[in-house]
Amino acid sequence: MKDLLIGTSTRYEWNQLKNWAKSIKNTSFSGDVVLVVMECSVETVKTLEEHGITVVPVNKTLDYKSNTPVHVERFIHMYHYLKNNEYRYVISTDVKDVIFQQNPIDWLEENLDNKKIVCASESIQYLHESWGNNNLMSAFGKYIHNEFYEKEIFNVGTLAGEHKYIKDLMLHLFLASINRPIPIVDQATYNIMMHTEPWSTITKQAKSEDGWACQLGTTGDPTKLEIFKPHLLENIPVYKEGEVYTSTGDLFYIVHQYDRVPDLKAKIDAKY
């Protein structure tokens, strides 16, 4: 059975998608690469398809009773695609700020063990990350904030696992994110799920040092690292000639938020 890499895009052009698209093709990944698009130029669609990316326009006939921002709406469209297409492993990532340095399927086969999903740590707790901490409070209020503000943060932009579990995770993320007091709630919703049953039992909570995915918004951003570093739960990534490694020298499979590190972004842009 085939594997899948899936992402979503709205109003992104090829220049914003090329690093994601080209980098996965630069690995040994042999599964389907699908981009669900809400709005996209004909020229960009053509270029994506020329690079082996399957472009899936959103199904505008779906009636899901929601007027949500695109970063929440994306989950129902990915759920709809997964409901109608069967795979073994499914990898879902952001697309504008993600690249692949190795085939992510290799990591899943070697490390997922008896778990069904993998989530990627941001290497910091909510109480030490002001944006996330405020977002959690604004999305769910004081009671829920008090329950979770000491928890480790996991990033919703780099998740993966077995098909049926990722499919249903997409549905639950959508359902739990709609009708909230603020529009940006997907990250807070995801973290509450990852820290509660049944999700916490079936999910491998991957540290940055496990090499699955680095989250450079907290572990690499030079404008924030001085503030975050005393509170980080593990060592920070290392850069070598435009590649990103764990502190022990293992090449990351996925690099997320590389655009937060200007020198690294310049090298990645030049490569792809």
For the regions a protein language model found, what residue spans apply to each?
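Short conserved micro-motifs at the rims of enzyme active sites and ligand-binding pockets
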Residues: S130-W131, P262-A270
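GT-A fold catalytic core of metal-dependent nucleotide-sugar glycosyltransferases
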Residues: F75-G132, K167
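Catalytic core and acceptor-binding pocket of nucleotide-sugar-dependent glycosyltransferases
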Residues: F148-A266
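Short polar catalytic/cofactor-binding loops
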Residues: S9-E13, S123-Q125, D259-V261
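Short N-terminal binding/cap micro-motifs at the start of the first secondary-structure element
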Residues: E13-L17, H128, L264-K265
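Short, high-confidence coil segments that cap the C-terminus of an alpha-helix
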Residues: S30, Y87, N114-K116, G249-F252
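N-terminal anchoring/stem segment of glycosyltransferases
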Residues: M1-E73, H77-R88, K164
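Short, flexible, basic/aromatic active-site loop/helix in glycosyltransferases
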Residues: N134-E150
